[in-house]
């Protein structure tokens, strides 16, 4: 079983895996539209973390992890708990960056618009302000944003995730202005 990471699963890998590959999935875009009251915010003052939204023609780069044989259910149970804040699972096709490896199915955690923590779209400036001000049990929301942006930039320098990098720029401007 393979699991696709497009948010904190890219840079905070706290579960065992057998192999990992950089690549992308299609027909989605990454957006900071999911609220976090359990990791990067608190009830009443949620942080914002990424989810995926359907986007015909879109693509999202990330990392696929092969779960260890015999431990798939154990690791999936852990990931179900870690991604408990309104995420459900689905299966999609993953396209490895290394084109000599054929595409294959991966498990995907996605926060849909009908979950209680879904915040949805907002002006980028408002999302940046919310990220700038939020913190929770797993740390500041700014750390989540910066770790994700740095990781995507290192893994896939050619990825021009405008939403991610625009938010990074806006939040850094707020930090410098403080």
From Swiss-Prot:
Top-level enzyme category: lyase
Subcellular localization(s) per the UniProt record: Cytoplasm, Cytosol
Keyword DNA-binding found: no
Pfam families: ChaC (PF04752)
Reactions catalysed according to its record: glutathione = L-cysteinylglycine + 5-oxo-L-proline
InterPro entries listed in its UniProt record: ChaC (IPR006840), GGCT-like (IPR013024), GGCT-like_sf (IPR036568)
Keyword vocabulary terms for this entry: Cytoplasm, Lyase
GO BP term (any one): glutathione catabolic process
Annotated residues for binding of substrate: 3-8
EC number: 4.3.2.7
Disulfide bridge partners, by residue number: none
MF annotations from Gene Ontology: glutathione specific gamma-glutamylcyclotransferase activity
Active site as annotated: 83 (proton acceptor)
Principal location listed in the UniProt entry: cytoplasm
GO cellular component, one term: cytosol
Oligomeric and partner information: Monomer.
Cross-referenced PANTHER family: CATION TRANSPORT PROTEIN CHAC-RELATED (PTHR12192), GLUTATHIONE-SPECIFIC GAMMA-GLUTAMYLCYCLOTRANSFERASE 2 (PTHR12192:SF2)
Family: Belongs to the gamma-glutamylcyclotransferase family. ChaC subfamily.
Function: Catalyzes the cleavage of glutathione into 5-oxo-L-proline and a Cys-Gly dipeptide. Acts specifically on glutathione, but not on other gamma-glutamyl peptides.
Entry protein name: Putative glutathione-specific gamma-glutamylcyclotransferase 2
């Amino acid at each position: 079983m393979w699991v696709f990471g497009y948010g904190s699963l890219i840079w905070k890998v706290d579960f065992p895996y057998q192999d990992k590959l950089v690549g992308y999935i299609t027909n989605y875009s990454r957006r900071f539209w999911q609220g976090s009251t359990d990791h990067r915010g608190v009830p009443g003052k949620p942080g914002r973390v990424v989810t995926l939204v359907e986007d015909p023609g879109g693509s999202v780069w990330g990392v696929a992890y092969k779960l260890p044989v015999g431990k798939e259910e154990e690791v999936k149970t852990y990931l179900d708990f870690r991604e408990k804040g309104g995420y459900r699972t689905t299966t999609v096709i993953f396209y490895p960056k290394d084109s000599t490896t054929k595409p294959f199915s991966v498990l995907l955690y996605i926060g849909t618009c009908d979950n209680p923590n879904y915040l949805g779209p907002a002006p980028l400036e408002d999302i940046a302000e919310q990220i700038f001000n939020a913190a929770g049990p797993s740390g500041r929301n700014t750390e989540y944003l910066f770790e994700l942006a740095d990781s995507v930039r290192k893994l896939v320098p050619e990825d021009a995730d405008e939403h991610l990098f625009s938010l990074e720029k806006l939040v850094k401007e707020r930090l410098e202005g403080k």
